[in-house]
Amino acid sequence: MSLLAVGINHNTASVELREKVAFGPDKLSEALKQLNANAHVNGSVILSTCNRTEVYCDVKGVAKNKLIDWLSVFHQVSPEELKPSIYIHEEQAAIKHLMRVACGLDSLVLGEPQILGQVKQAYTDSRDNKSVDASMEKLFQKSFSVAKRVRTETEIGGSAVSVAYAACTLAKHIFESIAESTVLLVGAGETIELVAKHLSANGCTKMIVANRTRERALGLAEEFGAEVISLNEIPDHLHRADIVISSTASPLPIIGKGMVETALKTRKHQPMLLVDIAVPRDVESQVGDLNDAYLYSVDDLQSIVDGNIEQRKVEAIQAEAIVSEESAAFMSWMRSLQAVDSIRDYRKSANEIREELLSKSLQSLAAGGDPEKVLLELSNKLTNKLIHAPTRALQSAAEQGEPAKLTVIRQSLGLENPQ
């Protein structure tokens, strides 16, 4: 087994190049088929996401540049355009890279959990296309267990590192269960869409989307089962909301102190969380002066995010140590397999010599040969055959002036004890 990882990612390549080299579902099967048709490739897995394209291979003697050339031809991208952005990892470096990727240590957002699912899907797709050999199977399964260990032993994924996620995390801290809470989302842009996804993933089913245009809001409503209202209708529905998360492009505040004060009276002063992640602000700052209204601005959330990013960097130190330990252990296992193969081949060779000479000796005895002479000849020939290769190795090491190699051979033959 000889491992090779070749790829590009968000650190080395522009989004335009990443788009060109991406393996969509329509290309993946053909790509794996072409890789496996190569006599030098024992197994392969292709990982292709918006931020990276990587090819992992178990190879035997294949030149690294041949794999790059294949990528170039397959995607019809010139080598001159591709090569400056390519990175190549071999053996333990390839093992360590895959483990870092699976753990989220090589991600654009440090510690993000989605990449593990993407690596698992890449492995499954490659296995379904019968391109995963036993060695690749072992490598990827080990990488999954390392990612699980990192998640268990560190807090690298435990803190919010996006404003949208931080808003949802804040809501979970304040309310015992957001599954029982009604959430009013003001706006229908990308940030609010991310917020809705995080809320839905945490069990929230009661969402109201308020937007200037109903068309955009209807898309979110259909995806998340939300109710749609216009911005003008917010005063009539605000009292229903336990949580308000707002992100619009409005130049003026949409939710004022008086509007919230009225809603709180209708709610009989049940607490209301308002998270304003718009710039300029959607919620008047004076709302924060009201009892039972808890207002957080984008700056409040950003400070939480910044602190969490720093915390993830601290946790990443321990995660990197785990990956280094596990990749070294896996490399040792790989080397032990190579030793097993060598031992098996050496025993096979010795047995073939023994059987050949024994057969000749038995024939001599059957023909009436002197048993003593036959046995003496057998022992001499067996000795000469078995020591021929080690003798040549000793001579070669001595002639080439390689004392270290000579010492290793002598130790292997039991001629001197290891220090």
Curated annotation (Swiss-Prot):
Pathway in which the depicted protein is active: Porphyrin-containing compound metabolism; protoporphyrin-IX biosynthesis; 5-aminolevulinate from L-glutamyl-tRNA(Glu): step 1/2
GO term, biological process aspect, one: protoporphyrinogen IX biosynthetic process from glutamate
One GO MF term: glutamyl-tRNA reductase activity
Presence of keyword Oxidoreductase: yes
SUPFAM superfamilies reported for this sequence: Glutamyl tRNA-reductase catalytic, N-terminal domain, Glutamyl tRNA-reductase dimerization domain, NAD(P)-binding Rossmann-fold domains
InterPro entries noted in UniProt: 4pyrrol_synth_GluRdtase (IPR000343), 4pyrrol_synth_GluRdtase_dimer (IPR015896), 4pyrrol_synth_GluRdtase_N (IPR015895), GluRdtase_CS (IPR018214), GluRdtase_dimer_dom_sf (IPR036453), GluRdtase_N_sf (IPR036343), NAD(P)-bd_dom_sf (IPR036291), Shikm_DH/Glu-tRNA_Rdtase (IPR006151)
Enzyme Commission identifier(s): 1.2.1.70
Residues annotated as the enzyme's active site: 50 (nucleophile)
Binding site for substrate: 49-52, 107, 112-114, 118
Enzyme class: oxidoreductase
Residue numbers binding NADP(+): 187-192
One Pfam assignment: Shikimate_DH
Top-level taxon of the source organism: Bacteria
Signal peptide coordinates: none
Keyword NADP recorded: yes
Reactions it catalyzes: (S)-4-amino-5-oxopentanoate + tRNA(Glu) + NADP(+) = L-glutamyl-tRNA(Glu) + NADPH + H(+)
Keyword terms: NADP, Oxidoreductase, Porphyrin biosynthesis
Site entry: Important for activity: 97
HAMAP family in alphabetical order: Glu_tRNA_reductase
Family annotation (NCBIfam families): hemA
UniProt note: domains: Possesses an unusual extended V-shaped dimeric structure with each monomer consisting of three distinct domains arranged along a curved 'spinal' alpha-helix. The N-terminal catalytic domain specifically recognizes the glutamate moiety of the substrate. The second domain is the NADPH-binding domain, and the third C-terminal domain is responsible for dimerization.
Extra information: During catalysis, the active site Cys acts as a nucleophile attacking the alpha-carbonyl group of tRNA-bound glutamate with the formation of a thioester intermediate between enzyme and glutamate, and the concomitant release of tRNA(Glu). The thioester intermediate is finally reduced by direct hydride transfer from NADPH, to form the product GSA.
Family: Belongs to the glutamyl-tRNA reductase family.
Task of the protein: Catalyzes the NADPH-dependent reduction of glutamyl-tRNA(Glu) to glutamate 1-semialdehyde (GSA).
Assembly: Homodimer.
Record-given protein name: Glutamyl-tRNA reductase
Protein's gene: hemA
